[in-house]
């Protein structure tokens, strides 16, 4: 499964992606937060803008706001959409939208019965367990989901969909983290509501094929958005090879780097952002 980058057919073509680059490049120059250190850079901002614009949902839920750049971006992509922005810490915002509705609660703790979740878009940039988030989306009726943090096996600070498909499990970085308990393992395998476990407690997930099998039963489309550029090395300093880090072909060839300097400089900010459409 290490080579998996897609399942099903994405609702856009590579040609459409390529043709949108120049429009986004002009938009990117107008971003309100020029230095978004710690947040999204051009590879994922382009991906998010393009996918949201193409899906054109009437409601967008974004989990994880940080400085607020993503809120602005979603406004540009879908000017008529209702945007619901949630983050446990709203104090970091530098851009505050007059259109968005803000909540300082977790995605799991909000009543979503007031919106048509089946046509809404859920955008996650909260560095949480993506497999558990997708379970919640299934329970709440969301079908269209974007995960900004989609790290490959052995990398990153959260359990990603890419890792789940690979069967590699997840090993938290740092100290003071907990191994997955027997109850948490059972809840995950039975697809039980992940709010049965603490939301912001990163646990070790042993290598397994259960999660990949459950994803295949419930996912209609899984599509990793291509990077704008692909460098020789990853952000972690090792070789960016297809064997270790399966990646869609980049949108732009390396020979075009002088014409897109910022995109080339920020190429290492790419972490396999993906779109997921759940089966209805």
Predicted feature residues:
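A short alpha-helical cap/connector motif
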Residues: 1-122, 128-280
């Amino acid at each position: 499964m290490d080579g998996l980058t897609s399942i099903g057919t994405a609702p856009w073509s590579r040609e459409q992606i390529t043709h949108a680059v120049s429009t986004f490049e002009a938009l990117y120059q107008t971003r309100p937060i020029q230095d978004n250190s710690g947040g999204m850079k051009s590879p994922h901002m382009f991906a998010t803008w393009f996918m949201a614009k193409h899906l054109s949902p009437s409601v967008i839920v974004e989990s994880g706001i940080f400085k607020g750049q993503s809120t602005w971006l979603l406004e540009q992509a879908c000017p008529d959409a209702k945007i619901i922005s949630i983050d446990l810490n709203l104090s970091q915002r530098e851009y505050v939208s007059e259109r968005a509705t803000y909540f300082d609660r977790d995605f799991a703790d909000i009543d979503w019965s007031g919106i048509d979740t089946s046509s809404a878009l859920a955008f996650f940039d909260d560095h949480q367990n993506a497999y558990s988030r997708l379970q919640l989306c299934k329970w709440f009726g969301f079908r269209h989901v974007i995960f900004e943090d989609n790290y490959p096996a052995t990398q990153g600070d959260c359990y990603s969909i890419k890792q789940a498909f690979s069967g590699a499990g997840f090993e938290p970085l740092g100290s003071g983290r907990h191994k997955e308990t027997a109850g948490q393992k059972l809840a995950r395998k039975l697809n039980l509501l992940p709010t049965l476990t603490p939301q912001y407690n990163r646990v070790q997930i042993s290598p397994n094929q259960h999660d990949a099998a459950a994803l295949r039963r419930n996912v209609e489309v899984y599509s990793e958005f291509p990077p704008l550029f692909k460098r020789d090395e990853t952000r972690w300093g090792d070789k960016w090879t297809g064997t270790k880090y399966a990646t869609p072909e980049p949108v732009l060839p390396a020979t075009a780097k002088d014409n897109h300097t910022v995109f080339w400089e920020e190429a290492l900010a790419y972490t396999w952002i993906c779109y997921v459409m759940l089966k209805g």
